[in-house]
Amino acid sequence: MRLSVRKVLLAVGCALALVLAVQLGQQVLECRAVLGGVRSPRRMQPEQEELVMLGADHVEYRYGKTMPLIFVGGVPRSGTTLMRAMLDAHPEVRCGEETRIIPRVLAMRQAWTKSGREKLRLDEAGVTDEVLDAAMQAFILEVIAKHGEPARVLCNKDPFTLKSSVYLARLFPNSKFLLMVRDGRASVHSMITRKVTIAGFDLSSYRDCLTKWNKAIEVMYAQCMEVGRDKCLPVYYEQLVLHPRRSLKRILDFLGIAWSDTVLHHEDLIGKPGGVSLSKIERSTDQVIKPVNLEALSKWTGHIPRDVVRDMAQIAPMLARLGYDPYANPPNYGNPDPIVINNTHRVLKGDYKTPANLKGYFQVNQNSTSPHLGSS
């Protein structure tokens, strides 16, 4: 018995010595490589790059840079909230509320690239483009994945993220983008009347806001075209409202997601588990609780100053480029589907449900500001 124990101890000792010898040999080789000026970067293993989350249904979800993320964006007041609410109504998709931080971090990354002096300093410090991109990739994925419940398909809605579509497509090669497009006159009227603060936009001036709208949508549209039609789909707000079923079928086909009738009734899933989460501080919340309706389409007509109407084609040339008539007040957007007409009658009669957790907020909000119906 004593002999067998000795043999076991001897075998264990030999094994430990072998392991230590192998590790020591590896360290010697690494030291030689460093001294010789050849340093191979340590790369994360594929399993380390995955983000693992457990859903309320006890299903494990794994997220990584190769997953098909969805990015929804556009100039604010162009229907981005409506679009993401419709996607949130799908049982396999989760967008959630605006993160607000993702477009700011993307803007910082862009600023570092544009500044030659700053880029030189970063490179000297070893903070190369590869290091920054890996950090951005991990940060963005972490924020998108963890700011809401896990789902098979994750989506992000921060309007200005689509100013960086080309960069995001490089970070997440299987991602797809939905660029919300809306008549700039309607978007600007909504910004001004609802007092939606946007950096750089002078809400006291239709001319200034239309000029800034034109610049913003021009950048986003160019990015969308550069990414390519197979990865970025322009979605016209007016057509989404007038023909929701047709538009959503096209959108889901583009995203490679199976059809579900729930996307046509997002208002029924607001505040419900696995449904549509809304923020009390987002300006569109009081509109998106209603079914898709026509109230917001032409509400801008008659409110834009005459001199701005006269100069519209010069102030906002992107209107014509996107297919809008800059001289029509309002343009003929098309004829609505019967369900949308019915929804509009319901909204005018107040025949829709306000989620219990938002009732007090809307009573206060409606007493302090004029009501604006319609989905935006």
Swiss-Prot record:
Residues 1-8 are cytoplasmic. The active site is at E98. One of its GO terms (cellular component) is Golgi membrane. Keywords: Disulfide bond, Glycoprotein, Golgi apparatus, Membrane, Signal-anchor, Transferase, Transmembrane, Transmembrane helix. Disulfide bonds join C95-C155, C224-C232. It catalyses: L-tyrosyl-[protein] + 3'-phosphoadenylyl sulfate = O-sulfo-L-tyrosine-[protein] + adenosine 3',5'-bisphosphate + H(+). Glycans are attached at N342, N367. GO terms for molecular function: protein homodimerization activity; protein-tyrosine sulfotransferase activity. The keyword Transmembrane helix applies. Residues 100-104 are annotated as: Interaction with peptide substrate. N-glycosylated. It is an enzyme of class 2 (transferase). Residues 26-376 are lumenal. It is found in: Golgi apparatus membrane. Its main location: Golgi. Pfam families: Sulfotransfer_3 (PF13469). The keyword Mitochondrion does not apply. It is a single-pass type II membrane protein. InterPro entries: P-loop_NTPase (IPR027417), TPST-like (IPR026634). GO terms for biological process: fusion of sperm to egg plasma membrane involved in single fertilization; peptidyl-tyrosine sulfation; prevention of polyspermy. Substrate peptides must be flexible in order to adopt an L-shaped conformation in the deep binding cleft. Catalyzes the O-sulfation of tyrosine residues within acidic motifs of polypeptides, using 3'-phosphoadenylyl sulfate (PAPS) as cosubstrate. Homodimer. Can also form heterodimers with TPST1. Belongs to the protein sulfotransferase family. This is Protein-tyrosine sulfotransferase 2. The gene is Tpst2.
